[in-house]
Amino acid sequence: MNTKTTVISQAELDAQFACCDKVAAYWQTKGRTPTAYVETYGCQQNEADSEKLRGFLAQCGYAIVGSAEGADVVIMNTCAIREHAEQRVFGNLGALTHTKRRHPEQKIFLCGCMAGETKVSDRVRHSYPHVDGVFSTHHLWQFPQILWNVLSGKKRQFFIEDEPGSIAEGIPQVRDSSLKAWVSIMYGCNNFCTYCIVPYVRGRERSRQPEDILAECRALIEGGTKDITLLGQNVNSYGKDLSCGMDFADLLAAIAQIPGDFLVRFMTSHPRDASEKLFDTMARYPKIAKQLHLPFQSGSSRVLKAMNRHYDRETYLQKVNYAKKVMPELVLTSDVIVGFPGETEEEFEETISLIQSVHYASLFPFISPPRPGPPAAKMDDPTPKDEKNRRFDRLCAVQNAISEEIHNSYIGKTLRCLVDGRDKDLLTARTEGGRLVRFPGRDDMIGTYQNITITAATTWSLSGKAADIC
């Protein structure tokens, strides 16, 4: 089932910008520039959302600062994927009690995926009276109104009602980087994996119109952006709720044909919807990075079925093998869950054998049990924690050896890399496949592509020498 996607009207957005003007006027009467701090937890989509929050704050006249201490506004943009992350948020939220005691006029807001959980908003309402507002991801576009309501003396704000199907275009953004950019192409997820809470807190899949995405990408490229990452909980489902007939491969091809010197990449891909058409498109266009994050989660078909992943081991391997055939230089990464409820030792060994077969450049492993809420939390889970930790350690050892082997294969090769910063006395850069490279160089190289010859490698990164530096 696809939710009908609606776009927030210009009149509704104008009302939000009017609230920005009211907030700015409020601070003008105070005779000083207000400050704001945004703390982001979790995934790249949350990072993109925080850029929009900072955009609204800038429109309201706030200067962005790097600490909650003394800030006039504090926003905690939260993640609900792991229970540990939620507990960390509550701990930090509690610590803000002392910050607000020192600065009584400070306004504190909680947003993001946690805010979409009724139990979280209820807990904040009753146990964290110093928090001035809670709003879910569906209400991010209404933040100026929420902020103005608080500043003008209205009661605590709770914008948490489920509002699926809405997309807001034209929200200002203050991006973290001028070189790299996140571009959200869709929101929500329809897959309902049994361990995942995302569909419950971010809603069903909603795709942005292709012309809006293309316009955003063109503006970024014209402004000097060199690396664009397209974001979605499942980018491969893009367009299924639109009437234009454009799927994700079509969108990717259209972006790759925009004039300019840049790369486009994407995350996250669900194997269920990854197609040969997508892989052929990636192979065809040089501006599409030959990097693919394709989470397999388990090497056991039985466990995959219990996860409600909609594919089996054989299907996953067929797709990966085709992708590697048409893109021999492809850099593959993945997520994997260790100790899913009911996973046997034999099924864990199937995961190990898949890792050894595919040869991922890196993995992002997680230990089950799943967080409370999704169906997997209620499954029988007889495997002791110590055994799960043992499996986790073994998996990491296997993957670390593979990562080091892959990185060692780069030694002696010259790779085109985007130089993105400095780490102490070395510059840092990223290969087309997303590998970290450190090398000696000049600051004027930052923001440019450089040909770097790899001279050394570790499990986690590469070292090299720029071609134009002897």
Named regions from a protein language model:
Residues 1, 6, 376-470:
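Terminal RNA-binding accessory module
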Residues 1-238, 277, 314-325, 353-357, ...:
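Proteins enriched for Cys/Gly/acidic motifs involved in redox and nucleic-acid/cofactor modification
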Residues 80-81, 202-203, 242-245, 305-312, ...:
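Short glycine-enriched, charge-decorated loop/helix-capping segments at active-site entrances
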Residues 105-110, 117-119, 221-345, 356:
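Conserved SAM/AdoMet-binding glycine-rich loop
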Residues 176-179, 189-191, 288, 298, ...:
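Short flexible coil/turn linkers enriched for glycine and charged/polar residues
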Residues 193, 213, 230, 266, ...:
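Conserved, mostly hydrophobic/aromatic
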Residues 343, 350, 358-360:
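Contiguous mid-protein beta-loop-alpha structural module that forms a pocket-lining wall or clamp
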